[in-house]
């Protein structure tokens, strides 16, 4: 029998300044939480975005 594969989960990237959901990603479970600097169109600048699960 083969091992079952871990399926990718849908996660949201939430802006730390405004709390808005600006991006969605598909990521395999496990590992550290993402924290990326992405563009926020409402503020018109790059801000830190943190991972939040569905």
Swiss-Prot record:
Gene Ontology cellular component annotations, sorted alphabetically: cytoplasm; ribonucleoprotein complex; ribosome
Originating organism: Rhodopirellula baltica (strain DSM 10527 / NCIMB 13988 / SH1)
Pfam families with a match to the protein in the record: Ribosomal_L33 (PF00471)
Gene3D superfamilies with a match to the protein in the record: Ribosomal protein L33 (2.20.28.120)
UniProt-listed GO biological process terms: translation
Listed SUPFAM superfamilies: Zn-binding ribosomal proteins
An example molecular function term from Gene Ontology annotations: structural constituent of ribosome
Keyword Ribosomal protein included in the entry's annotation: yes
Disulfide pairings: none
Protein biosynthesis found in the keyword field: no
Alphabetical UniProt keywords: Ribonucleoprotein, Ribosomal protein
HAMAP family reported for this sequence: Ribosomal_bL33 (MF_00294)
Lineage: Bacteria, Pseudomonadati, Planctomycetota, Planctomycetia, Pirellulales
Homology family: Belongs to the bacterial ribosomal protein bL33 family.
Protein name according to UniProt: Large ribosomal subunit protein bL33
